[in-house]
Each structure stands twice: as structure tokens, then as C-alpha cells.
């Protein structure tokens, strides 16, 4: 709430990072995790700020962003970052069971392009930046031509990537990334096969 208050007092437009996790399963997935629940409630609060105070914002839904300088270890690590880290350390790639969970992956360059677009406009819009193709986590792991280690299934795990359509009374404007995950991984493997 401190960020909302600061923007409101200083008449600053907020670019808010939303999550598609809160929209999955026709909105029922918002209670799957504290993260999805909090993001969902913040969107409701933003809508009210707009109605009450003419608050300016743009909301962007991100889908598994990957690319240079991504986080590769720890709780905030990206799927692609974890796989790259394990590949470089010659460790089996960890895949949470069953592995058929599907996700959409978006390169950071495509993401930045949409963020810049949102910053320039002044329309109180909801935008999503994603890729048209989704992959199962197991499919992604197999792109690395590496050994795979299955981990136990996690509570609150989503099985499909929710493509955003409508949030509250807002249309979501879709932007599709141009950079292909297969090519990205292929380039990563070529680059590091020369080093190893």
C-alpha cells in the first residue's frame, strides 16, 4: 500500500506487475497461493483507486520471463534460469512431478518492449506479454539434452498457463513475443558447448 499511497500523493502513474496465476481456472486459482491472492486483491484495490481518485496506472501480466541476467538460484529463480544453472554445473535438471504442467515463456526483450509501451500510454489498460506457444516443464527440460531429476509434486501448483482475457471489467490487450524459446535454448547450448 505504501507504493500506491506514494504514487497517489505525488500524481505518479503506476506500472503494476500483475500475475496470470490469479486469473487461471476462471479466477478460481487466485486462492491457490498467497502470491496469487495478494496480486488479485491489489488489482481490485487499483480499480477502486481509479474510481475514487482518478488514479493513473497500467497493469502488465507477465509470463515466465527469461533471458540474460535472470535469477538462476534461490526461491525467486526462473525455470529457465534453474535449468541453465544445473546444465552448467552438470547436475540433473529438477522437474516437479508430473512435469506436464504447461507454461508460456517470454523473453526479457519482448517484455521490455511492452513495458515501454505501457509507460508511454495513458489509458489505464491491462496488457499481457506472452508467447503464443506453451510448453510443458518436461518439454523445456528436454530442450537442454540433459539428465532430469523428478521432484515431488508441490501444493498449489498450477497445471496450465492461464491466458488472460478479462480481469474485473477490463479487457486485456495481448502482446505476443517474437523471440522463440527453442532458439534461445539452442543458442545457449551452442555457446556453452564451446566453453565446456
List the model feature ranges, each with a label.
Residues 176-196:
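Amphipathic terminal alpha-helices
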Residues 98-100, 126-127, 135-141, 146-165:
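C-terminal "lid/loop" region of Rossmann-like NAD(P)-dependent oxidoreductases
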Residues 5-8, 32-63, 84-89:
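Active-site Tyr-X1-5-Lys
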Residues 111, 115, 129, 140, ...:
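Non-catalytic, hydrophobic alpha-helical segments
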Residues 32-35, 63-77, 97-108:
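Glycine-rich "substrate-gating" loop/helix at the edge of Rossmann-like oxidoreductase active sites
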Residues 14, 18-19, 45-69, 94, ...:
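Conserved beta-loop-beta element that borders a ligand/cofactor-binding pocket
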Residues 1-34, 58:
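Conserved Rossmann-fold NAD(P)-dependent oxidoreductase catalytic core, especially the SDR/UDP-sugar
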Amino acid at each position: 500500500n505504501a507504493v500506491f499511497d506514494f504514487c497517489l500523493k505525488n500524481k505518479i502513474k503506476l506500472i503494476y506487475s500483475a500475475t496470470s496465476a490469479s486469473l487461471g481456472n476462471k479466477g478460481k486459482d487466485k486462492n491457490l497461493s498467497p502470491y496469487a491472492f495478494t496480486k488479485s486483491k491489489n488489482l481490485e484495490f487499483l480499480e477502486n483507486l481509479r474510481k475514487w481518485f482518478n488514479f493513473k496506472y497500467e497493469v502488465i501480466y507477465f509470463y515466465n520471463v527469461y533471458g540474460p541476467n535472470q535469477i538462476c538460484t534461490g526461491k525467486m529463480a526462473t525455470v529457465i534460469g534453474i535449468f541453465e544453472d544445473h546444465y552448467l554445473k552438470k547436475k540433473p535438471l529438477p522437474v516437479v512431478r508430473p512435469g506436464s504442467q504447461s507454461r508460456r515463456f517470454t523473453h526479457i526483450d519482448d517484455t521490455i518492449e511492452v513495458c515501454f509501451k505501457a509507460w508511454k500510454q495513458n489509458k489505464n489498460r491491462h496488457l499481457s506479454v506472452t508467447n503464443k506457444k506453451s510448453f510443458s516443464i518436461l518439454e523445456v527440460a528436454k530442450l537442454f539434452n540433459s539428465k532430469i531429476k523428478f521432484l515431488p509434486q508441490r501444493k498449489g501448483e498450477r497445471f496450465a498457463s492461464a491466458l488472460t482475457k478479462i480481469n474485473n471489467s477490463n479487457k486485456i490487450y495481448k502482446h505476443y513475443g517474437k523471440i522463440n524459446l527453442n532458439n534461445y535454448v539452442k543458442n545457449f547450448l551452442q555457446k556453452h558447448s564451446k566453453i565446456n
